[in-house]
């Protein structure tokens, strides 16, 4: 689960060995690692270090999300989307999507997609959001191309 989600996120985020400012104005490094939220001492990072940071956050988020029945009852592909959202938005950001979560809880994936589509998230990361909405709706992704993330 964590490995597959990390590939999706690595593909979406891309890799940067040095700190840059993302689309929302946050200082970021590695695979979209927000240094204003999580501490990181250096101004440079290697791919293995960045991958470790990414997977550590995913493991932590996955563990926290398993306490919610709506997440625990999802199939693996849809769980990956939720993990991607939790990485991109943070857990607190994800939990603000109350109507989206309610639709997921009710297994109304078309409505969940609609809720996500109407959110600022969808405009900020269009390609990524489009892929995530496809997976939510169908339970599969048609066009996932894995780039080398290590």
Task: Indicate residue ranges for each PLM-predicted region.
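Long, amphipathic alpha-helical surface segments
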Residues: 1-21, 33-37, 45-56, 62-63, ...
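Extracytoplasmic
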Residues: 24-26, 77
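Active-site nucleophile-His-acid catalytic modules used for acyl/amide transfer and hydrolysis
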Residues: 60-97
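Generic secondary-structure boundary/loop-capping signal
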Residues: 17, 26, 68-71
């Amino acid at each position: 689960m964590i490995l597959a989600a990390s590939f999706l996120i690595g593909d979406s985020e891309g890799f940067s060995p040095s700190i840059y400012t993302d689309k929302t104005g946050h200082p970021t490094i590695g695979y979209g690692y927000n240094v204003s939220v999580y501490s990181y001492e250096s101004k440079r990072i290697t791919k293995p270090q960045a991958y470790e940071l990414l997977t550590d956050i995913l493991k932590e988020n996955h563990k926290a999300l398993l306490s919610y029945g709506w997440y625990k009852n999802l199939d693996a592909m849809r769980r990956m989307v939720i993990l991607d959202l939790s990485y991109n938005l943070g857990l607190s950001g994800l939990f603000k999507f109350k109507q989206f979560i309610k639709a997921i809880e009710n297994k109304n994936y078309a409505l969940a997609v609609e809720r996500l589509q109407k959110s600022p998230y969808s405009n900020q990361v269009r390609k990524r959001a489009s892929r995530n909405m496809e997976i939510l709706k169908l339970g599969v992704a048609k066009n996932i191309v894995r780039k080398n993330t290590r």
